[in-house]
């Protein structure tokens, strides 16, 4: 109530703001985050911002996700990325792969890059808290689905650890082994799933395999702050039929293959990360994002000789996203 509606450029802002909830105070001027102690002082509930030269925004309850200001890049060092033009003189103009987009204010499009304070420390780390908007949650367009930039092991970023979907050749149990590597609610305490009990369905949206094995009524994600991406969500990214079994069906969504062998080297093994979705026609297969081929594929769920990891997906209310 004591915040002035206008202030003359060059003046100082000096107001009392009581923080009873122990939120992190964040002050922005002209949409740039100011540094406490340098750009402003906040001592004993008194906020002082000197030399005002633009619009001021003050947050106690910060958005969980805010737009990235710098995009992640990787250098193409293998035939897969080279083959689609990431090389000097190639179709992409250089050997540098840029992941995602900075987007347009007020709009959300697949691949828009965000930094999300998932651990609740008040810091938006562009290196380890990078996410990409995929789509709105099915049946709830107030919630955004965002995918992490990296695979994880025990909830922390890891490029070179791989896990089975399930430990034996039976996909009808669900991805219980892969799920166990997702960030827990203690690790990513600032985000939560809209539903922690999820219905497991195959690529056709049905609840059993072609040979009659029923999937569990619910997958219990109650210990986890994130989940796996689904085949249904991938299908919504393109107007073409998926799976097409053709390389490059996801070339318009390369943010899905950041930090995989797509950019790094030649590799004859399947690589990428698991989707939540079991395959209907093969009850020992689960679907994956096949990263080097930029498409979906299916792999035996129990295999340990494939480079298939776990990549978290978070669900965030659009009210908690600055876009």
Predicted regions and their residues:
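Surface-exposed interfaces of beta-sheet-rich extracellular modules
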Residues: 11-45, 133
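Conserved "repeat-terminator" motif of extracellular CCP/Sushi domains
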Residues: 41-66
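Collagenous Gly-X-Y triple-helix signature in extracellular proteins
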Residues: 66-75, 79-323
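Short, exposed beta-strand/loop patches in secreted or surface proteins that constitute
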Residues: 5-6, 38-42, 105-106, 133-136
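Conserved N-terminal submotifs of small, disulfide-stabilized extracellular modules
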Residues: 1-9, 63-66
């Amino acid at each position: 109530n004591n915040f002035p509606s206008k202030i003359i450029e060059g003046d100082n802002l000096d107001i009392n703001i009581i923080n009873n909830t122990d939120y992190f105070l964040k002050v922005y001027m002209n949409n740039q985050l100011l540094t406490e102690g340098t750009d402003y002082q906040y001592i004993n509930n008194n906020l002082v911002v000197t030399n005002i030269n633009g619009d001021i925004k003050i947050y106690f309850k910060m958005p969980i996700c805010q737009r990235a200001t710098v995009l992640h890049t990787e250098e193409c060092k293998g035939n897969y990325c080279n083959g689609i033009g990431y090389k000097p003189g190639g179709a992409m103009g250089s050997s540098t792969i840029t992941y995602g987009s900075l987007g347009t204010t007020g709009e959300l499009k697949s691949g828009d890059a965000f930094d999300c304070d998932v651990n609740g420390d008040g810091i938006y780390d562009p290196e380890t808290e990078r996410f990409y908007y995929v789509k709105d949650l099915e049946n709830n367009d107030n919630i955004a689905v965002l995918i992490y930039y990296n695979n994880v092991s025990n909830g922390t970023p890891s490029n070179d650890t791989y896990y089975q979907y399930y430990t034996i050749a039976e996909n009808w149990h669900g991805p219980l082994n892969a799920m166990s590597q997702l960030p827990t609610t203690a690790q990513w305490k600032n985000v939560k799933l809209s539903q922690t009990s999820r219905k497991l369905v195959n690529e056709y949206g049905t609840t059993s395999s072609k040979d009659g094995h029923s999937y569990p009524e619910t997958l219990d994600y109650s210990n986890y702050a994130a989940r796996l991406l689904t085949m249904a969500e991938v299908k919504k990214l393109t107007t073409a039929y998926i799976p097409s079994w053709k390389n490059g069906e996801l070339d318009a969504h390369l943010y899905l293959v950041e930090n995989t062998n797509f950019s790094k080297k030649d590799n004859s093994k399947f690589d990428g990360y698991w989707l939540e979705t079991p395959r209907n026609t093969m009850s020992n297969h689960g679907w994956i994002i096949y990263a080097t081929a930029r498409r979906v594929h299916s792999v035996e769920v129990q295999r340990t000789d494939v480079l298939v990891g776990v990549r978290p997906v978070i669900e965030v209310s659009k009210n908690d996203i600055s876009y």
